[in-house]
């Protein structure tokens, strides 16, 4: 997060986003400097512990990789069991935690069987979203902002087809550039996980 802030994204450093993480959590371990207990996302320890994974942690420690019980303290280097967003054995996704409680609001429309095609810009400001609803291409205007939340693959893909990304790559694909932004769609790192 601090690298985001150092890149000019004011408000996106670790200290800036931590209060929002705390606000989002309902942490089963209880409230702490890094965790909240009143949020919509239930966070819990994994219920399974395997001897092989315990030994893996011991081996990692012998190579100088510290054991950690909490990867959400701002220093996520180490080896250990990660926590999960689940409650009573069921996944507590953003849809379950945030969307389900408000899905009947009059000012919210949930589209299913729809697929975003691209975002249209006006003077580098996102103005509308083009999307497919079934076989029909539709557009919706933004009154204030457009939030892209399509995961580590979908978000950069939509940015790129909308003209945000490496200018050479966009040009080779025949996409008109809105913003030359190297790094979009590159350098994906997944979380290393053993089970």
Features from the language model and the residues they span:
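Glycine-rich loop(s) and the adjacent beta-strand/alpha-helix scaffold that form part
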Residues: 119-122, 126-195
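Positions in alpha-helical segments
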Residues: 2-3, 157
